[in-house]
Amino acid sequence: MKELARFSVTLPNELFDEINKRVKNTEYPSRSEFIRDLVREKIIADKWKDDSQSDAIAVLSIVYSHHQNNLVSQMLELEHHADVKIACSTHIHIDKENCLEMISLQGSGKNIEKFSQKIGSLKGVKFSNLARIGITKA
């Protein structure tokens, strides 16, 4: 088992109550595990702000109209000339008008962000969300 460090944190009562409520309403076994996950999320978010990060991973989810002229060809053009590695993409037909595409990306955080913005700004893209993924050592 990994060594653990114990420390004390002082919180306003309202924040402490909110944490307890969230732990109780989720599957977290303890406040400690909940807090560990919050710290990991913050570390990952801060790593994404570091332009030198070269090993970033993300999933870009987009909803778009497949009836939009040239949209699919524009997306493919951007994907083939991207400065990021596209590990895979999954395409789902939502209805007669809309498609959902999920694109797994690897590369520098800066290049992933740039690629996401290019795709999200295309005419016909109705929704774009970049899920930034990171792995911490603990």
From Swiss-Prot:
One of its GO terms (molecular function) is DNA binding. InterPro entries: Acetolactate_synth/TF_NikR_C (IPR027271), ACT-like_dom_sf (IPR045865), Arc_rbn_hlx_hlx (IPR013321), CopG (IPR002145), CopG/NikR_regulator (IPR050192), Ni_resp_reg_NikR (IPR022988), Ribbon_hlx_hlx (IPR010985), TF_NikR_Ni-bd_C (IPR014864). Ni(2+) binds at H80, H91, H93, C99. Its cofactor is Ni(2+). Gene3D superfamilies: ACT-like. Chain A, domain 2, Met repressor-like. Binds 1 nickel ion per subunit. Keywords: DNA-binding, Metal-binding, Nickel, Transcription, Transcription regulation. The keyword DNA-binding applies. It holds the Pfam family RHH_1. The keyword Transcription regulation applies. One of its GO terms (biological process) is response to nickel cation. HAMAP family: NikR. NCBIfam families: PRK00630.1, PRK01002.1, PRK02967.1, PRK04460.1. Transcriptional regulator. Belongs to the transcriptional regulatory CopG/NikR family. PANTHER family: NICKEL-RESPONSIVE REGULATOR. This is Putative nickel-responsive regulator. It comes from Campylobacter hominis (strain ATCC BAA-381 / DSM 21671 / CCUG 45161 / LMG 19568 / NCTC 13146 / CH001A).
